[in-house]
Each structure stands twice: as C-alpha cells, then as structure tokens.
Amino acid sequence: MSDHSSQMKDVWADMDTTATEPVQAYLTATGERLRADGCEVRTEDWGGVPVLIGYRGDFRMRWMATKLHLFTVAAPTTLVTADALQRFTATAMDYVLARKGQLRGFQNGVAVFPALVGTQVEPAASAWAQGGQQMKFAAVARPVAVDAGSGRASAYRGNPALGFIYAAHLRSKLNAYFPVAGT
C-alpha cells in the first residue's frame, strides 16, 4: 500500500464517517454549488469513504500573472473535531499537491478547502477552522467545519498577510461553496 493510501485510511482513525441524511444532503448541495460555479466535480473513494472533490483553475493578471488551482475536498463524519479536521486538512493538502503542486511557485499556486461535514461540530474545531489558513510553499488550505443540521460553516474568511493577492478570490469561492448560515 502506498504512503498516500495509508494516509487516506489513517485520516479516518477514530471517526464515524457515516453520512446521515442531513450530511448527505449538504454534500449533494455542495456538489451542485461547485458545478454551478464551473468546477469539475467527482466523488473519490478515500480508504472506503466517499469524498466529494471539486476543482477549478483560474488565471488572473492581477495575481502577478499566476494560475490558482483551487480544490474543494469534502467528506462526511458524524462529529467534527479539531484533531479530525487537522488530519483531514493535512491529507487534503497532500492530495492537491500531488495533483497540481509540482510547479507551484512558478506562476502557479494551489489552494484547497478541506471540509468535514457532520451533524455535530466541536467548538474547538470551529475555532481552529476560523483561526487562519494553513500554509506551505505556494499552497494554502482554508479548513471548513460544517454543521449540516444548522448549515453553519466555520472557516477563515479573512485577509492573511501571506497569500493576500488571492484573499478576495478565496473568500468569494468559500462563500459560494460553503455559505454562511442564513444567507
């Protein structure tokens, strides 16, 4: 088994990945929002768990003539914990870097919205998601903790010091794919 395959299984350690009706409905709606925005959308098997993958690439001169490869990676769980979201974020980042990250930094950037969708979200998971983006060289992750029952999607929606040229774009896409509850 490859290291990546092992990591896929490890990410689910201590997690109940049952897709309850509200979780499945939220994931389906997220897939529809991704398609409506022009993303390529598919479902992949990650160690026995169906994971929603959305992808789009955008080029802007105002980004210093760079192309941003944006992935949305969303998976079901019953309880979103900070530890689970951190593991999932690391796995999602490795996944996108393996697909589009080889030439990053040379007029290419990679971003990912790793989202765990559950029927319960621990306050620590919401706080971690809202606390800031996770960075690697020319790559950024903005984790999302979703409570499928209330529709609340906790994520960093601010303006970071690093990667600021993409901030408005990432915030716009985050709001489109994971709208703030009540909007």
Q: How would you describe each model-predicted region?
A:
Residues 82, 122-127, 153-155:
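Switch/connector loops and helix/strand junctions flanking conserved nucleotide-binding motifs
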Residues 2-79:
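N-terminal, charge-rich interaction modules
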Residues 70-100:
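A broadly used, surface-exposed interaction patch
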Residues 101-108, 133-138:
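Arginine/glycine-rich "motif VI" loop of SF2 helicases in the C-terminal RecA-like domain
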Residues 67-70, 109-112, 141-142:
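Short, surface-exposed beta-edge/turn micro-motifs
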Residues 103-128:
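Nucleic-acid nuclease catalytic cores
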Residues 131-183:
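Charged, structured surface patches that assemble and position nucleic-acid processing machinery
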Residues 85-88, 126-133:
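"Short basic amphipathic alpha-helical interaction patches in structured regions
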